[in-house]
Amino acid sequence: MTEYLFTSESVSEGHPDKIADQISDALLDEILKQDLKARVACETYVKTGMVLIGGEITTTAWVDVEEITRKTINDIGYVNSDAGFDANSCAVLSAIGKQSPDINQGINRFDPLKQGAGDQGIIFGYATNETEFFMPAPITYAHLLMQKQSELRKKNILPWLRPDAKSQVTFKYNNGNIIAIDTVVLSTQHQENITQKYLKEAVMDEIIKPVLPDKWLTKNTKFFINPTGRFVIGGPMGDCGVTGRKIIVDTYGGMSRHGGGAFSGKDPSKVDRSAAYAARYVAKNIVASGLAARCEIQLSYAIGIAEPISIMIDTFNTGKISNSALISLVRSIFDLRPYGLIKMLNLLQPIYLKTAVYGHFGRKEFPWENLDKVNELS
């Protein structure tokens, strides 16, 4: 019998790094509404009283960077200085340039199917049958806890909650199967006048218990709610935030490998983002078809080259056919060239702000979660 623990974390939409991700993707969406051929690499930095937006953007669109930034922060819930950040009074600074023509000549082609990758890179996708979402349980439930915190805050059910929060869930496995939840950590920013006793009871009763399945909670499950005892100072006042610093939260919670490339603020010509979505799409369809219980796929690209340089698949000894046979199937069914995967997944649309919080994967509203290749794979 082989028992082990595995832990994943998530953060709320009010976490500083997630504020940055959302601003970058909000700007990307507004640009794509006007210009589907735009090249966008938008980075955001937030700290007390200020937002700095930089990067490279080449587009025919005009967007009001300041207005979009303030609206995004306001929608998150930072509407006055009491929470440590104010959408209406913070400074918004812009240092945006254009995409290098050296890069552009490797991407744009007269024949779009020959569109080259926007950069070199290694990309991973993953799926598992351990949850209904074909996602690992630790990251799934860490996200659900954060979504519940946001829901209760925005509906004023727990009006003393503030936007910044973090969760961490540790599952116990036996031979790859979940047997229990070992530990739950949840820290949430709050108003100053709330007692710790009341906060802990409310978080347990209103956030944790409604989200986590009873079948995995035992008398030995440990709960740590605001373990420092106080979380009043949060958001950008507590820590600076930068686009792309929560890449494990954005993907599989550490259950799968990661190529290192972040997602937010990048248009689909950047394979860091678009090929990661395609890799998830491939892995999920393989698992849903019954060809494997778990599947990880690696793709690699070279700048300016259309075809992937390599494809690797690992099914962790759960595959019904060999990994090499799976790779052959993938090559015949999925178009993994940059333009091919953009078209396959309909990525040229303004859907990216929604991806910037609570994970890019395991959410049915996104096209890379479709299971429309299951029959072809079966």
From Swiss-Prot:
Reactions catalysed, as given in the entry: L-methionine + ATP + H2O = S-adenosyl-L-methionine + phosphate + diphosphate
Listed GO MF terms: ATP binding; magnesium ion binding; methionine adenosyltransferase activity
Cofactor binding: number and manner: Binds 2 divalent ions per subunit. Binds 1 potassium ion per subunit.
CDD domains: S-AdoMet_synt
One Gene Ontology cellular component annotation held by this UniProt entry: cytoplasm
Binding site for L-methionine: E56, Q99, D239, K270
Subcellular compartments: Cytoplasm
Quaternary data: Homotetramer; dimer of dimers.
Biological role: Catalyzes the formation of S-adenosylmethionine (AdoMet) from methionine and ATP. The overall synthetic reaction is composed of two sequential steps, AdoMet formation and the subsequent tripolyphosphate hydrolysis which occurs prior to release of AdoMet from the enzyme.
UniProt similarity note: Belongs to the AdoMet synthase family.
Protein name: S-adenosylmethionine synthase
Gene name of the encoded protein: metK
